[in-house]
Amino acid sequence: MSFTVAIVGRPNVGKSTLFNRLVGKKLALVDDTPGVTRDRRPGDAKLVDLKFRIIDTAGLEQSAPDSLQGRMWAQTEQAIDEADLSLFVIDAKAGLTPADETLAEMLRRRGKPVIVVANKSEARGSDGGFYDAFTLGLGEPCPISAEHGQGMLDLRDAIVAALGEERAFPPREDVAETDVDIRPAGAGGGEDEESEPAYDKTKPLRVAIVGRPNAGKSTLINRFLGEDRLLTGPEAGITRDSISVEWEWRGRTIKMFDTAGMRRKAKVQEKLEKLSVADALRAIRFAETVVIIFDATIPFEKQDLQIVDLVLREGRAAVLAFNKWDLVEDWQAVLADLREKTERLLPQARGIRAVPISGHTGYGLDRLMQAIIETDKVWNRRISTARLNRWLESQQVQHPPPAVSGRRLKLKYMTQVKARPPGFMISCTRPEAVPESYVRYLINGLRNDFDMPGVPIRVHFRAADNPFESKARKRR
């Protein structure tokens, strides 16, 4: 991206609506409730022929530094310092307020380029607010409607004028040519097409951090990053949007998603909380590995188990992190109890990796990252058809399929049809009659014999092809 733009303003003036308009997606939560946005959210924006990085910020209201509003103010100030330009959004319909004037003074002191954006200018009676914006002393305001997309061309021209042509349109870097493999797919230089592909260690890994409110999700991510990137505090439910951050661990790019705390469905009444939970669910579906944060001082609440079940039903790789380990006293006894409960209460995730950590002190974070990488390897694993069919034969010798209605089931052929998560197809007689207990037997066998702990495994059955069926039809 060529430059960075911060969107700032008091609460409920349409900052997140403008952010969504510029990134071309509904990434930020939008609601009539003031103060929806709390953390700063980055995104890749496109405005006509401009491409740039943009940061959505919390609505600015001066408060005590230790209060939630004060910590939100500090986050927004950091975004302004990172940016090359600020879009100062005002509500042209409502007109200027003392809070707008306070923000204008703060932006003037920063000494960076500022564009006053008079949003909601399509509304009747917005002219007064537009002309009042001249009194802020930050230049000519740019009238727009973020909701309807009006005034975007004028905003583009204002950005170019504020930054200058050279900064707004940096020269393109020449991309060096690289050798390209032009062999057709499958021409692997004599390699067996059934060989199991190696794990790609260079691919960025998407990780979602989920859990109940106040389990320490944002604190954990801040510890990974080594900075107070996300708002934290004793208040439950601080995080509302699913915020993504990128960093590197041992040369591997990690894209980590902080999510809103997920309460029991019956307790979620407010529209805004429902939007936050829906955003967290989207983050789970977009992620590859999901870290479920348990509070080690009160683990295995009913909601914890429901979150694990949700993650596995979505087909994601899961890792458990028992946070706040620094508050545990008899840690050996607690650890033994947690391991026993993990095996007993989560039979659908047998062998799931569970790591005691402390987001506050940093204890166990290296082991947690190793568990994430190892679980992702299993989630991506592919097994050759030859190995699977040898395994299927041995499983039937050890435990033959049961007879249903006096007729023995026959499992004839097995292959892996997908990874992420591992999915297998077995050709058999009467697939609809295979008992659930025998399906579990096969899944547990796959998990143990091919070392696939803690990831969801899908096994499907289909009717075996009958080679005599076509001849029988011809006779008819």
Swiss-Prot record:
Cited Gene3D superfamilies: 3.30.300.20, P-loop containing nucleotide triphosphate hydrolases
Keywords recorded for this protein, A-Z: GTP-binding, Nucleotide-binding, Repeat, Ribosome biogenesis
Entry-linked PROSITE patterns: G_ENGA
Function: GTPase that plays an essential role in the late steps of ribosome biogenesis.
Residues given in the record as GTP 1 binding sites: 9-16, 56-60, 119-122
Region (Disordered): 178-199
HAMAP family to which the protein is assigned, alphabetical: GTPase_Der
A GO molecular-function annotation: GTP binding
Pfam families recorded: KH_dom-like, MMR_HSR1
Binding sites annotated in the UniProt record for GTP 2: 211-218, 258-262, 323-326
Domain KH-like: 381-465
Name recorded for this polypeptide: GTPase Der
Organism of this sequence: Sinorhizobium fredii (strain NBRC 101917 / NGR234)
Family membership: Belongs to the TRAFAC class TrmE-Era-EngA-EngB-Septin-like GTPase superfamily. EngA (Der) GTPase family.
Domain EngA-type G per the UniProt entry, residue ranges: 3-167, 205-380
Record GO biological process: ribosome biogenesis
Gene that specifies this protein: der
Subunit structure: Associates with the 50S ribosomal subunit.
